[in-house]
Amino acid sequence: MHDILHIIKGEVDSTAATLRAYSHDASIFEVTPRAVIYPKTVGDIKKLIHFASKERQAGVDVSLTVRNAGTCMSGGPLSEGYIIDVSRHLNHIGHVDTEDRTLWV
């Protein structure tokens, strides 16, 4: 986990209160994550994916699960690995292209 702190601009939280809060969503399931990561940039997400890939190549089991509001009713955003919460910093609408009907969030 300390390696992650050095490669991203965002925050990493593994306090008991945070892990408890992220151990459930709107479903009946409960799974405690290793830590919660709050990326500040898209670049942070790319670095996290690269980190996980390198760890897996080294034989370390690393799981990244993206979570937003935690309202899923199927347990989808729950994981024993790292939770990537994009709702803290990556929560604004960027470029909107009405002609192509696309937008960047």
Model-assigned labels for residue ranges:
Residues 95-105:
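Hydrophobic, small-residue-rich alpha-helical packing segments that form membrane-like cores
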Residues 7-9, 89-92:
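Short small/polar-residue motifs
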Residues 3-23:
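Conserved oxyanion/phosphate-binding beta-strand-loop segments in alpha/beta enzyme cores
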Residues 20, 24-90:
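Glycine-rich N-terminal segment of FAD-binding domains in flavoprotein oxidoreductases
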